[in-house]
From Swiss-Prot:
Pathway: Amino-acid biosynthesis; L-histidine biosynthesis; L-histidine from 5-phospho-alpha-D-ribose 1-diphosphate: step 4/9. One of its GO terms (cellular component) is cytoplasm. It is an enzyme of class 5 (isomerase). Keywords: Amino-acid biosynthesis, Cytoplasm, Histidine biosynthesis, Isomerase. Its EC number is 5.3.1.16. This is 1-(5-phosphoribosyl)-5-[(5-phosphoribosylamino)methylideneamino] imidazole-4-carboxamide isomerase. It comes from Pyrobaculum aerophilum (strain ATCC 51768 / DSM 7523 / JCM 9630 / CIP 104966 / NBRC 100827 / IM2).
Length: 229
């Protein structure tokens, strides 16, 4: 499964290089992108401002995106309360949490109990360390994170993002044990550095069930492997 992403900052769709604010390869209309990706099986939507603020910020435009996509989306970015998770699930098929398991374990566990079939966990990492709070804080090693997540799983999905190559088209960089992730989630997705269909195939060969793409949509080429593109 190839999943296009729409990252929202200040009401606009952007693609940051390595997640750095002000360092973009793309800026545009998120509603136009949603219409363009309407035939995709799933769209990954991130509230970048929300990830930094700790709560959904761009809810108005995200609501319109979800309406265009008829709910075929997964939404993350600042979901650090049960209310925020439920708000995301009222718009999209899945809610994506990254900081919550490391910032508030009891609340995360409760969310998993209530919504495990619609809850995805995002592991954004660099140098073997999971990053949270808009990629500004180190939370745990990947191995420690997986051990902790096993306690409350399984989940609908785990999303692995290689921050080092995110937004660069630098190729797949996934030095992580995919098999260990498949023990805690139905599906495991990869994001970061994907430029073209060769990178997509490499991710599949490593055992990932799907690939989230951003850079490849604006500066790469997916025409041979994405029938919605």
């Amino acid at each position: 499964m190839i999943i296009p992403s729409i990252d929202i900052e200040g009401g606009r769709a952007v693609k940051r290089i390595r997640g750095q604010r002000g360092n973009y390869i793309f800026q545009g209309d998120p509603l136009e992108l949603a219409a363009r990706f309407r035939k995709a099986p799933l769209v990954h939507v991130v509230d970048l401002d929300g990830a930094e603020a700790g709560g959904l910020v761009n809810i108005s435009v995200i609501s319109k995106i979800a309406e265009i996509l008829e709910g075929r989306c997964e939404l993350g970015g600042g979901l650090r309360s049960l209310e925020a998770v439920e708000r995301a699930l009222s718009l999209c098929q899945y809610a994506v949490v990254g900081s919550l398991p490391f910032k508030n374990w009891p609340l995360f566990r409760r969310a998993a109990e209530l919504y495990r079939d619609r809850l995805a966990v995002s592991l954004d990492y660099r140098g073997g360390e999971v990053l949270v709070g808009g990629w500004r804080e180190k939370a745990a090693s990947i191995a420690e994170a997986v051990r902790r997540l096993e306690e409350a799983g399984p989940y609908a999905a785990v999303i692995v993002t290689s921050v080092e190559v995110e937004g660069t088209g630098g190729g797949v960089k996934a030095d992580i044990d995919v098999k260990s992730l498949k023990r805690i989630a139905r599906r495991v997705f990869y994001a970061g550095g994907v430029r073209d269909c060769n990178d997509v195939e490499r991710a599949y060969a490593l055992g990932f069930d799907g690939v989230i793409v951003g850079y490849a949509l604006y500066a790469g080429d997916l025409k041979k492997c994405a029938n919605w593109y």
